[in-house]
């Protein structure tokens, strides 16, 4: 960033820094990075846009959202119907804004939908569910307490699983 300043380019350069997802070192019995837990699916994303106030924003954003965001910022037309992502310019302009409710993760027969509050995963064999996990990301950041049998969350769990099935069907088209 200092070099962009020195060259006089900082006022016209968008900087995007993203990282790879995490690596389990024995947490939850995993060694590696290929599973549906938050530690293995969450990745850092830092975006610096000239004339945008800096800060930390919440909300759900996926890497597929970067391209449409850059298109909007650079006033480049977005190819209609060809992108899965959605511009997160509204979040850059106001950290309280949201562009989507869920992020979707898929790995080897497992499907996970992640909202700001919950992470819900199912594993399918054919159309049959053979495993489930639900975590409250506010009260259990480390994902240690599977809430799948929680009566108090039954409606939320049902809605999250419905969203997983909808997203899975969309991807199969």
Predicted features along the sequence, with ranges:
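Histidine-centered active-site microenvironments of extracellular/periplasmic hydrolases
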Residues: 1-52, 59-62
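Secondary-structure boundary motif
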Residues: 6-9, 97, 149
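C-terminal cap/loop subdomain of S1 sulfatases and analogous C-terminal strand-loop tails that border
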Residues: 21-27, 33, 48, 53, ...
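Active-site-proximal N-terminal segment of extracellular/periplasmic enzymes that hydrolyze or transfer
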Residues: 145-152
């Amino acid at each position: 960033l200092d070099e962009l300043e020195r060259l006089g380019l900082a006022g016209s350069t968008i900087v995007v820094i993203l990282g790879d997802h995490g690596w389990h070192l024995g947490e939850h019995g995993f060694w590696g990075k290929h599973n549906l837990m938050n530690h293995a699916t969450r990745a850092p994303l830092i975006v610096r846009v000239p004339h945008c106030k800096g800060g930390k924003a919440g909300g759900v954003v996926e890497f597929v959202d970067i391209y449409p965001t850059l298109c909007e910022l650079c006033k480049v037309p977005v190819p209609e119907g060809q992108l899965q992502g959605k511009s997160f310019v509204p979040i850059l302009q106001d950290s309280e804004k949201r562009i989507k409710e869920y992020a979707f993760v898929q790995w080897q027969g497992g499907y996970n939908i992640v909202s700001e509050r919950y992470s819900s995963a199912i594993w399918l064999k054919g159309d049959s569910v053979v495993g489930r996990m639900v975590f409250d990301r506010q009260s259990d950041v480390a994902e240690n307490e599977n809430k799948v049998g929680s009566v108090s969350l039954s409606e939320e769990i049902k809605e999250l699983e419905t969203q997983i099935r909808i997203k899975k069907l969309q991807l199969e088209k």
